[in-house]
């Protein structure tokens, strides 16, 4: 029988529910249990695919092509699993599916209501996420905070699950903030008490509290919360601020969180062996070197827009015993005249993805600086496309060369729309999304980075591609197409072989990086940057 764990939040948003859920998932996985995890987002968008990065941060893409919340990146990195489209559910997605069924007459003339139709659809998503992965345990995080009007159908669905599958198969975990008032010199429990009262008013009694705090929590405070919130005192778990996120699973294990969960759900599983994880954390805490990487992006005011890129750089740094000193460079600020001033102190330069024209000329100048000064450079998605544009302009002398996306009237459309995208008008969910194979060119830097594999599978999110009409001219000038689709139609990786490391990929390698298993192309880039700093 599948066990269901529901993680809710109270008092404030962005309290760390996702990290708590991911950390618990890691502990349960290391007990030998098969775990999956999902995120409920109460916003009305179908998915975050068309949302501004300033609103939502990065869009995380799964193997099967779902555009999802960035928390799924935390889930995959912590638990080291590959999630699917059932792992992210929004209000918009549920309502659109229910309304589509209503239009088809599938409700047989019934009045379609929040209860039971919306809540049934939500419960079906929970069960589908578990069944498609054959999991022993599914952890479901509900975005937002208890009391938000848009969360009510989600919480009602969670309440109903207890009756549907039995109380012994369901556990409710509530995360809250425990503020410390310096003036009073004490922690205040009232916000948590009221949050739990609100949750109980909706019919959900939490079985565990996870309290986010900056200071250590005395046992007396835990006992008080246990008494007023009707949970066992040992089930009041402290989640204190830490230097590195990957410490959190160890901190939760030290408080027997996973054992309490197993006892409640009657899961007979051995103790979690966190030896490898602990060794990784110890290494992270004691890195001996520092490498400066300049990230040239258009959304640098919000680092979450590049969360997976940053984490992938860190992971590759761990493998090289180096901390990553990230220098955020706004692409709008980079010109041919100041590129050396902005980028001259960087050991390596990364140019990540993005959409739209703003900042693209600055990215092109950053790529030009890296090429002309032989600074290790990694381009991702749009960064790969602009690498091709830069080479066309400044090496092949194709004046005005550009991407058709950015300048439809260009004489040299180096990057063009994919053939199967020409007639598509909708923006959401219509890109080339998900896992696709990439055939590597033997002897190339890309092939060496991937240990001379013939083919790798990586996740994509794009609508435009390199225009093959120009391929022969590029190759004649020494531009190497080191990764292509198996049918040789789509360019996946480009590079300049004579440079220390000048490689750009159409796909998003960062989405498959893990703290204890870094992505190979990122690792090759960081390794080259370290050598460049010596």
UniProtKB/Swiss-Prot annotation:
Cellular component terms (Gene Ontology): cytosol
Alphabetical UniProt keywords: ATP-binding, Glutamine amidotransferase, Ligase, Magnesium, Metal-binding, Nucleotide-binding, Pyrimidine biosynthesis
Job description of the protein: Catalyzes the ATP-dependent amination of UTP to CTP with either L-glutamine or ammonia as the source of nitrogen. Regulates intracellular CTP levels through interactions with the four ribonucleotide triphosphates.
Pathway named in the protein's UniProt entry: Pyrimidine metabolism; CTP biosynthesis via de novo pathway; CTP from UDP: step 2/2
GO BP term (any one): 'de novo' CTP biosynthetic process
Binding annotation for L-glutamine: 54, 354, 382-385, 405, 463
Organism: Streptococcus pyogenes serotype M4 (strain MGAS10750)
Residues given in the record as Mg(2+) binding sites: 71, 141
Record text on activity regulation: Allosterically activated by GTP, when glutamine is the substrate; GTP has no effect on the reaction when ammonia is the substrate. The allosteric effector GTP functions by stabilizing the protein conformation that binds the tetrahedral intermediate(s) formed during glutamine hydrolysis. Inhibited by the product CTP, via allosteric rather than competitive inhibition.
Pfam family of the protein (one): CTP_synth_N
Protein name per its UniProtKB record: CTP synthase
Binding positions for UTP per the UniProt entry: 13, 188-193, 224
Lineage of the organism: Bacteria, Bacillati, Bacillota, Bacilli, Lactobacillales
Annotated binding of CTP, by residue: 13, 148-150, 188-193, 224
Gene3D superfamilies: 3.40.50.880, P-loop containing nucleotide triphosphate hydrolases (3.40.50.300)
Keyword Cell cycle: no
Misc note: CTPSs have evolved a hybrid strategy for distinguishing between UTP and CTP. The overlapping regions of the product feedback inhibitory and substrate sites recognize a common feature in both compounds, the triphosphate moiety. To differentiate isosteric substrate and product pyrimidine rings, an additional pocket far from the expected kinase/ligase catalytic site, specifically recognizes the cytosine and ribose portions of the product inhibitor.
Domain (Glutamine amidotransferase type-1) ranges: 292-534
Xref: InterPro entries: Class_I_gatase-like, CTP_synthase, CTP_synthase_N, GATASE, GATase1_CTP_Synthase, P-loop_NTPase
Family: Belongs to the CTP synthase family.
UniProt KW Cell wall biogenesis/degradation keyword: no
Record NCBIfam families: PRK05380.1, PyrG
EC nos: 6.3.4.2
Database matches in PANTHER family: CTP SYNTHASE, CTP SYNTHASE-RELATED
MF term (GO), any: glutaminase activity
Binding-site positions, ATP: 14-19, 71, 240-242
SUPFAM superfamilies named among the record's database cross-references: Class I glutamine amidotransferase-like, P-loop containing nucleoside triphosphate hydrolases
Active-site annotation: 381, 508, 510
């Amino acid at each position: 029988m599948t066990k269901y764990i529901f993680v809710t939040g109270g008092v404030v948003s962005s309290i760390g529910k996702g990290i708590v859920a991911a950390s618990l998932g890691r502990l349960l996985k290391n007990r030998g249990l098969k775990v999956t995890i999902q995120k409920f987002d109460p916003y009305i968008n179908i998915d975050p695919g068309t949302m501004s990065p300033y609103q939502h941060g990065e869009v995380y893409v799964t193997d099967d092509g779902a555009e999802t919340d960035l928390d799924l990146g935390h889930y995959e990195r912590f638990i080291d699993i590959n999630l699917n489209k059932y792992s992210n559910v929004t209000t918009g997605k549920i309502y659109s599916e229910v309304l589509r069924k209503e239009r088809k007459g599938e409700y047989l003339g019934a009045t379609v209501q929040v209860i039971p139709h919306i809540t049934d659809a939500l419960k079906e998503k929970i069960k589908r996420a578990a069944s498609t992965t054959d999991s022993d345990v599914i952890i479901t995080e509900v975005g937002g905070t208890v009391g938000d009007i848009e969360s009510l159908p989600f919480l009602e669905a969670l309440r109903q699950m207890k009756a549907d599958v039995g109380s012994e198969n369901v556990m409710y975990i509530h995360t809250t903030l425990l503020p410390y008032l310096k003036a009073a010199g004490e922690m205040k429990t009232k916000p948590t008490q009221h949050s739990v009262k609100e949750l109980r008013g909706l019919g959900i009694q939490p079985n565990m509290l996870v309290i986010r705090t900056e200071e250590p929590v005395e046992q007396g405070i835990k006992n008080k919360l246990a008494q007023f919130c009707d949970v066992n005192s040992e089930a009041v778990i402290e989640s204190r601020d830490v230097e590195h996120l990957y410490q959190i699973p160890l901190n939760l294990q030290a408080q027997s969180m996973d054992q309490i969960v197993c006892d409640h759900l009657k899961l007979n599983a051995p103790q979690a062996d966190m030896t490898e994880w602990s060794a990784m954390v110890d290494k992270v805490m004691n890195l001996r070197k520092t490498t400066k990487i300049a990230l040239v992006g258009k959304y640098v005011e919000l680092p979450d827009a590049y969360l997976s890129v940053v984490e992938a750089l860190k992971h590759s740094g761990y493998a090289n015993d180096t901390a990553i000193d990230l220098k955020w460079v706004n692409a709008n600020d980079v010109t041919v005249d100041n590129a050396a001033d902005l980028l001259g102190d960087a050991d390596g330069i990364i140019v990540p993805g993005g959409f739209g024209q703003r900042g693209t000329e600055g990215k092109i100048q950053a790529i030009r600086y890296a090429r002309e000064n032989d600074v290790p450079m990694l381009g991702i998605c749009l960064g790969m496309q602009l690498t091709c544009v830069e080479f066309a302009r400044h090496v092949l002398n194709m004046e005005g060369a550009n991407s058709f996306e950015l300048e439809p009237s260009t004489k040299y459309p180096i990057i063009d729309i994919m053939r199967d995208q020409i007639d598509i008008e909708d923006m959401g969910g219509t890109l080339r999304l998900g896992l696709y194979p990439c055939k590597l060119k033997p002897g190339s830097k890309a092939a060496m980075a991937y240990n001379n594999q013939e083919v790798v599978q990586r996740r994509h999110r794009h609508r435009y591609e390199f225009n093959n009409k120009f391929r022969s001219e590029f190759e004649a000038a020494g531009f190497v197409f080191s990764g292509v689709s198996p049918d040789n139609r789509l360019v996946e990786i480009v590079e300049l072989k004579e440079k220390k490391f000048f490689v750009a990929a159409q796909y998003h390698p960062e989405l498959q990086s893990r703290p204890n298993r870094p992505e190979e192309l990122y690792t090759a880039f960081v390794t080259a940057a370290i050598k460049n700093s010596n």
